[in-house]
Amino acid sequence: MSFSLDELAASLGATVQGDAGLIVKSIAPLDQAGADQLAFLSNPLYLNQAVTSGAGAIIVSPRDLETLTAEGHAAGRNWLVAANPYAAFARIAQRFAALGARPAAAGIHPSASVGEGAVVPASCSIGPNVTIEAGAVLGERVRIAGNSFIGADAQVGDDTLLYANVSIYHGCVVGARCILHSGVVIGADGFGFAPDFGPQGGEWVKIPQTGRAIVGDDVEIGANTAIDRGAMADTVVEQGCKIDNQVQIAHNVHVGAYTVIAGCAAISGSTKIGRYCIIGGAANFAGHLTIADRVTVSGGTSITKSIPKPGHFTSVFPFMPHADWERNAAILRGLTRMRERLQQLEQQVKHLQQSS
């Protein structure tokens, strides 16, 4: 379970400065790494840690290596030089993880239930108490852990991994090489009810949700996230998206490719999120909005209008000591009166100027 630096460099298109034959056995943080471990420097704020690190080698950018060299700290050390050290670290970490992974045995557990006409290739691994309903189609090497549910006519692409207790409702589609963590629900009914109330009362009338939820290739979805099916058209999450735990994606939402969404965010129905967006934790979006490509939304922000062009958007009031917040809140409550008073003063000044 080890790699040489030149082997890692070749896989990344990186270069080695120092001993290219050095063998590293794992990756560790700069301040904890030992002589047989690889660390990474992706933020120049940690240059001092790189100087004192005991790592056998460090992944570094050309610019940071220039700084270390100019300060006399690079000589006699081993450096794996990559344009994007953080991405290089991630890819190397994947290689080490693959070395230690225990492959799932192909086959269907005796307690699993497979419906009539379902397609389950021999290369798939189906865990205990899994239900695969009639007409569902799995790709090659799909792994489904215990107690998961695949609804009728649903589709799951090649090499996708479903952890325990994942539910994919009828007719929904999950692409290839996806990872769905425990508790994910794909294709539950969207929150659709028509009000029918009069003077004597009434009720909320359920709107059947007849669309699907479609998840593209290479998507990872965190634990207990829900992606609802569309009311009539489909809910879509395009390829390469990464979605954190406990995120709500409502019916008819469309999330563009390679967008990332942090935990507890909520996107209301029929909103369209562009490609390459970054959505912070607990951000929330009103319904029927359109968000441009490459928009960043800070955590906790409420988006109530469409965003037509790229940029970074924040609506969160900065935190402060509670007593200060209470004083500021009291001032905010009086803003209308203050505005009216200011207008009166402006009129008085204008009158005095005209009289002089």
From Swiss-Prot:
Pfam families: Hexapep, LpxD
Keyword Lipoprotein: no
Keywords, alphabetical: Acyltransferase, Lipid A biosynthesis, Lipid biosynthesis, Lipid metabolism, Repeat, Transferase
Stored InterPro entries: Hexapep (IPR001451), Hexapep_transf_CS (IPR018357), LpxD (IPR007691), Trimer_LpxA-like_sf (IPR011004), UDP_GlcNAc_AcTrfase_non-rep (IPR020573)
EC number per UniProt: 2.3.1.191
Catalytic activity annotation: a UDP-3-O-[(3R)-3-hydroxyacyl]-alpha-D-glucosamine + a (3R)-hydroxyacyl-[ACP] = a UDP-2-N,3-O-bis[(3R)-3-hydroxyacyl]-alpha-D-glucosamine + holo-[ACP] + H(+)
BP-aspect Gene Ontology terms: lipid A biosynthetic process
Gene Ontology CC annotations of this record: membrane
GO molecular function, one term: N-acyltransferase activity
Chain segments annotated as coiled-coil in the UniProt record: none
UniProt keyword Lipid biosynthesis, yes or no: yes
Family: Belongs to the transferase hexapeptide repeat family. LpxD subfamily.
Function: Catalyzes the N-acylation of UDP-3-O-acylglucosamine using 3-hydroxyacyl-ACP as the acyl donor. Is involved in the biosynthesis of lipid A, a phosphorylated glycolipid that anchors the lipopolysaccharide to the outer membrane of the cell.
Protein name: UDP-3-O-acylglucosamine N-acyltransferase
Organism field: Ralstonia nicotianae (strain ATCC BAA-1114 / GMI1000)
Lineage start: Bacteria, Pseudomonadati, Pseudomonadota, Betaproteobacteria, Burkholderiales
